[in-house]
Curated annotation (Swiss-Prot):
SUPFAM superfamilies: Ribosomal protein L20 (SSF74731). The keyword Disulfide bond does not apply. InterPro entries: Ribosomal_bL20, RIBOSOMAL_L20_CS, Ribosomal_protein_bL20_C. One of its GO terms (cellular component) is ribosome. The keyword Ribonucleoprotein applies. This is Large ribosomal subunit protein bL20. One of its GO terms (biological process) is translation.
């Protein structure tokens, strides 16, 4: 069996790592050892931050909804509770988008939530609420 030299493979691997390290500062973009460590770390950060990104967006949507709902005299928590009581299932991303781009439709949702909360306050139960979409 013929002897396999690893030079071509090693060179290809090094090129791949250095290409991934393009744009890094100092030795991290030139030397293979530093570049490999930096690329490995950057992949860990990317993995972690893909999860953090989802949390950040959810927090942003909640802040936007809260700001929009307060114009109608409700808090975010009361609004979400009212939507649940009314049987309206819309996620926070869509609610945030509606608050920005379709204020009339968002206002209708707020009024439905208010109505459900008032009905609950009057009767003490939300099970027989007429406006419920169940």
């Amino acid at each position: 069996m013929a002897r396999v030299k690893r030079g071509v493979t090693a060179h290809a691997k090094h090129k791949k790592v250095l290409k991934a390290a393009k744009g890094f500062y100092g030795r991290r973009k030139n030397t293979i050892r530093a570049a490999k460590a930096a690329v490995d770390r950057s992949k860990q950060y990317a993995y972690r931050d893909r999860k953090v990104n989802k949390r950040n967006f959810r927090a942003l949507w909640i802040q936007r909804i809260n700001a929009a709902v307060r114009e109608f005299g409700l808090t975010y928590g009361r609004f979400i509770d009212g939507l649940n009581k009314a049987g309206i299932e819309v996620d926070r991303k869509v609610l945030s988008d509606m608050a920005i781009h379709e204020p009339e439709a968002f206002g209708a949702l707020v009024n439905a939530a208010k109505k459900a909360l008032e009905y609950l306050k009057e009767t003490g139960t939300a099970n027989e609420f007429e406006g419920a979409v169940r």
